[in-house]
From Swiss-Prot:
Residue runs in coiled coils: none
Compartment(s) where it occurs, according to its Swiss-Prot or TrEMBL record: Cytoplasmic vesicle, Secretory vesicle, Acrosome; Cytoplasmic vesicle, Secretory vesicle, Acrosome outer membrane
Keywords for the protein's UniProt record, in alphabetical order: Coiled coil, Cytoplasmic vesicle, Membrane
Its job: Plays a role in fertilization through the acrosome reaction.
Family in the record: Belongs to the FAM170 family.
Expressing tissues: Exclusively expressed in adult testis (at protein level). Expression first started at postnatal week 3 in round spermatids, elongated spermatids and mature sperm.
Gene name, Swiss-Prot/TrEMBL: Fam170b
The protein's assembly and partners: Interacts with GOPC.
Organism: Mus musculus
InterPro entries: Spt46-like
Listed Low complexity bias regions: 277-339, 349-378
GO cellular component annotations of the record: acrosomal vesicle; outer acrosomal membrane
Protein name: Protein FAM170B
């Protein structure tokens, strides 16, 4: 038994029929049948354009607990295409309005001059000229117009969503397929500029590709999404870091000046204290000075008493012990004036003295002997 759902106006929707079955049949199988293929069970999916039912009709169909069978017609396909085109047209108009509201911004592409051998960079530009890649390169900047993003996409989350929308834009603006003859002619064309190997070139800091001219590098930085990879996110991140570093360097001297000014103001406030505020501060200072003087006097008295005790006579034993403990100090010798030597009589032995005395006594004895001889001669 089939029933047709009719709108409130009394008109039947063209090309749409809803089949309703008994609740027993609904328990066995519940699914939505599409003409192009089968869907999973109990899975909701978007339905093309005018094939959507009004809210009231869907509510009635749900209460019936039946199986819904959708059948599309050429009119429904054309209406779905019209709906997708209208959605794209509304999105394109909203995008153009956003572009009018936000003026285009510029971003700097980072690159360096290099010398290449078969497309491979072997030396790059430094402050002293072209040197091997082990040295620090001289990085240059070139401005290009920034690619506009959708609202709601953050800077850090770059953006599978942004890339997807841009790829869709490229597909919409791509020219229509040409004849096979034109395709054959395209195969005979020369390779692009960025594939040509030269002795000199410009190397992109983000992707390290070498380009023959600055125009080719800027075109790559702006429309690199067509090749499947965009260097713009890298350039924006590097410039953002550079800005934050410059801001920190600018803030450091300002903070130093503020600290100096604050310290000078504090010193001024301390010097500009009112006299009635100075008096209570002076009183405790005077008390402290008096206390210090008293303490010094007490210390002096104690020292004097200690010295007096040391000067009192000690017993002999203690004095001897102190003398023993004290090391012997050498006394300086006194120099006496030299006196001339005088001959002194050497001591003679007793025997020699006796002999001399005997000799002195001998002459009178000889005289006595000679006298009798003389008398005899007479």
């Amino acid at each position: 038994m089939k029933h047709h759902l009719i709108e409130h106006r009394g008109e039947q929707t063209p090309g749409t029929a809803v089949g309703m079955a008994s609740p027993d049949a609904a328990e066995e199988s519940t699914g939505v049948c599409w003409p192009g293929g089968a869907m999973r069970r109990n899975e909701s999916s978007p339905r093309p354009g005018p094939a959507f039912l009004p809210d009231d009709d869907i509510y009635l169909a749900a209460r019936a607990q039946g199986v819904l069978g959708w059948s599309s017609s050429p009119s429904s396909q054309s209406s779905s295409e019209y709906q997708s085109y209208s959605q794209y047209q509304s999105w394109d108009s909203s995008k153009s309005e956003e572009q009018q509201e936000t003026p285009p911004e510029s971003v700097c592409a980072l690159y360096t001059h290099v010398q290449t051998v078969r497309g491979v960079a072997v030396a790059w530009e430094t402050d002293d000229g072209f040197e091997p890649v082990t040295r620090k390169p001289l990085i240059r900047e070139a401005e290009f117009i920034k690619r506009q993003r959708r609202k709601g996409s953050s800077f850090e989350m770059a953006s599978n969503t942004d890339l997807r929308w841009e790829l869709e834009d490229c597909k919409h603006y791509c020219p229509q397929t040409e004849d096979p003859v034109d395709c054959c002619m395209q195969e005979l064309r020369a390779p692009p500029d960025w594939l040509v190997t030269t002795n000199h070139g410009l190397r992109c800091v983000a992707c390290c590709r070498v380009f023959p001219t600055l125009e080719a590098l800027l075109d790559h930085a702006q429309h690199g999404i067509q090749d499947g990879f965009s260097c713009q996110i890298f350039f924006e991140e590097m410039l953002e870091r550079k800005r934050t570093r410059d801001q920190k360097q600018d803030q450091q001297p300002v903070e130093e000046e503020q600290s100096l000014s604050d310290s000078s103001e504090c010193t001024r406030l301390l010097t500009k204290v009112l006299p009635w505020q100075q008096q209570p501060q002076q009183q405790p200072q005077e008390q402290q000075k008096q206390q210090q003087q008293q303490q010094q006097k007490q210390r002096q008295q104690e020292q004097q008493q200690h010295q007096q005790q040391q000067q009192q006579p000690q017993p002999l034993k203690q004095q001897q012990q102190q003398q023993q403990q004290q090391p012997l100090q050498p006394q300086p010798l006194k120099q006496q004036p030299l006196q001339p030597l005088q001959p002194q009589p050497q001591p003679q032995p007793q025997k020699q003295q006796q002999r001399q005395q005997q000799r002195q006594q001998q002459p009178p004895r000889q005289q006595q002997k000679q006298q009798p001889l003389q008398q005899q001669g007479k």
